Amino acid sequence: MKRPRSRLWYDGLENTPHRVYLRAIGFTSDDFQKPLIAVVAAWSEAGPCNFNVLPGSLRVKEGVRSAGGVPLAVPTIVVNDGINMGTPGMRYSLISRELIADTIEAQVASHGFDGWVGIGGCDKTQPGIMMAMARLDLPSIYIYGGTAEHGVLDGETVTVQSAFEAVGAYLKGLIDEERLYEIEKAAMPTPGTCQGLFTANTMAILAEALGLSPLGSASPPATSSERARELARAGALAVGLVETGLTPRRILTYEAFYNAIVTLMAISGSTNAVLHLLAIAREAGVKLALDDFDEASRKVPVIAALAPAGKYTMVDLHNVGGAPVILRKLLDRGLLYGEAVTVEGVEIGKLLSKWEPRTDYNILYDFDKPYKPHAGLRILRGSLAPRGAVMKIGASGILKFKGAAKVFDSEEEAFKAIERGYVEEGDVVVVRYVGPKGAPGMPEMLKITAAIVGAGLGEKVALITDGRFSGATRGVMVGHAAPEAAVGGPIALVENGDEIVIDGEKGTLDVLLGGDELARRRDKWSPPPLPKQGLLRKYAKLVTQADEGAVTH
C-alpha cells in the first residue's frame, strides 16, 4: 500500500530511532508497511457537543484498521459555544477556529502521517478542521460527531433554543420559574450538538455539499448505531484516499463552494457559515466573496422547515433522508454543480442519483411551493456597512425595517436594557465593538436575540451588530457589519435616535445621516485600546474583517 509521507519518517536505517518511538507504543514490523492515518479528535467533556467524539474516534480507528491502515489519535481543542453565550468566554469561540486549524497543521505535518480523519462537533471545530484540510492538502476526510436528540415536554419538541428563549419569556413574566426549570431539564436529553439547524448542523450539511464528508453522514444522531457506522466508514475511506491520492484542493473548487452556498440558502442555515466558507476558501486558494452569497440568495428559496426557521430538528431531517434529499432537489433544479468531486472519489451528481427527491410539506418542500419564497440569508451593503453585512431572513420573513437606533457598546449593556424594558417595539438595537478586533473574537449575540424573542419582540425590534449570531437566532437580525466599530466603521458613529433603514429586498443597510455629519462624528472618534496581553491581543492584531472571513493570515 502507498505510504507517501510515513516512509520518509520511518523507513531506512537512518530512521531507526524514529521506529523505536512507535515500537514503544505497540507498533510491529508489519505496521511500518501500512499507511499511517491520524485520527484528529476535537474532544472535550466541557459540554455535550463533543462529548462523544473520543469514543467516536475508536470507531474511526476500527475503520482505518479494516482498510489496512494504522491509526494514531491526536487531539485538538474545543470551545463550547452554547455554554459561553453571554460570557467573556464567548470571545474565544471564533478564535478557537484558528487555533484548531493551527494545531492540526502542527501535529499532522510533523509526524509523517499519510492521511487523516477529522472528527468535529461544536460550531468552530468543524470549519477549523476543514480549514486544516485545505491548508495541508493531504488525503483527508471530515466526519461529524453527530447531533443530540431533541427533548419532548408536554408533547412538544424542545431544544436548547427553547431554553435560551425561555429566559426571555421568564424575564417578561410570560412563564414562571418552575416552567423554566422544566424546560431546562427536558431540552437536551443526550450528548451531541445543538439539535436544530444551528451552526453545528449547518456546517455538517455543508461539509456534504462541499464534498469533504460522505453523503448521508451529517444527520445520524450522536448516540445512534448509524453514527457509529458512519465513523467507521470515514476511517476506511481515509485509507482509500491515500491510495488514490485524492486531496482536498481537488475537491474544494469554486463549484464545490457554490454548491455549499446554495445549500446554505435553501436550508436557511446559520449566518456563521458565511464566515466559515470564506475562511475555508481562503485556505484552498479559491476566490470567494460576499457577492457570491448575494447572487445565490436571489436564486434559491427556503425548502426546509428546520429550526429556527421552522420547528423541525436534525433528527427529523434524518428520518426523511438527511442532507442528500435536499441536495438532490437542488441538483434536479439545476442549482448544484453535479460534476463536483467528493471524498468518495465520485462526482456528487452520480452519488445523489441513489437518493430519491422527497416532499412532505412538513419538513421538506418543493421549489415551486417553497417553505419561504426567499433565501435564508441576504447580503446587505450601504452607509452603515460599506463592505457588507449578513441578514438572516429565513426565520422571520421580514425583509424591511425602519426605526430609531438604541446604541450599546457591549452585549451586556444591551441585555440589561432589554431586561429592564428599555428596548421597545420599533427600536433598532445597535450592538457594536463586538467585531473580530473589537471584542475581540466577534462573539455571538444569542443571549440578546433570545431575550428579544422571548419577550415577544422578535419581529418588532431589529438588531444590528458587528458581532455574530448563533445559528439558533431568529428575528430581524443583521450581523457581521463591516468595517467593524473598532477600526472606525460607520457603525461606530451611530448615535441614539438615528434613523436606520434595513431593506433586504434591495440589499441595503443605511443610517439616514449626511456625509458632513458622519465626517464631524468621525473627527471625534478614537479607536479602543487592544487587550494588554495574551491570546486576545495576538488575535486582535492579526484578524481580518468579517467580509474576509475573520481569518488571521
Curated annotation (Swiss-Prot):
What does the record give as the active site?
470 (proton acceptor)
Q: What is the phylogenetic placement of the source species in the record?
A: Archaea, Thermoproteota, Thermoprotei, Desulfurococcales, Desulfurococcaceae
Q: Which cofactor does it need?
A: [2Fe-2S] cluster; Mg(2+)
Which NCBIfam families does the UniProt record give? ilvD (TIGR00110), PRK00911.1 (NF002068)
The molecular function GO annotations come to:
2 iron, 2 sulfur cluster binding; dihydroxy-acid dehydratase activity; magnesium ion binding
The name this protein goes by in its record? Dihydroxy-acid dehydratase
Q: Subunit structure, briefly?
A: Homodimer.
The entry sums up its family as follows: Belongs to the IlvD/Edd family.
Q: Please provide the record's keywords in A-Z order.
A: 2Fe-2S, Amino-acid biosynthesis, Branched-chain amino acid biosynthesis, Iron, Iron-sulfur, Lyase, Magnesium, Metal-binding
Q: How is the cofactor bound?
A: Binds 1 [2Fe-2S] cluster per subunit. This cluster acts as a Lewis acid cofactor.
The record's annotation in PROSITE patterns points to: ILVD_EDD_1 (PS00886), ILVD_EDD_2 (PS00887)
Q: EC top class, in one word?
A: lyase
Q: In which pathway does it act?
A: Amino-acid biosynthesis; L-isoleucine biosynthesis; L-isoleucine from 2-oxobutanoate: step 3/4; Amino-acid biosynthesis; L-valine biosynthesis; L-valine from pyruvate: step 3/4
Q: Per the record, what are the reactions this protein catalyses?
A: (2R)-2,3-dihydroxy-3-methylbutanoate = 3-methyl-2-oxobutanoate + H2O; (2R,3R)-2,3-dihydroxy-3-methylpentanoate = (S)-3-methyl-2-oxopentanoate + H2O
Q: Which residues carry this modification: N6-carboxylysine?
A: 124
Q: Which EC numbers does the record give?
A: 4.2.1.9
Q: Where does Mg(2+) bind?
A: 81, 123-124, 444
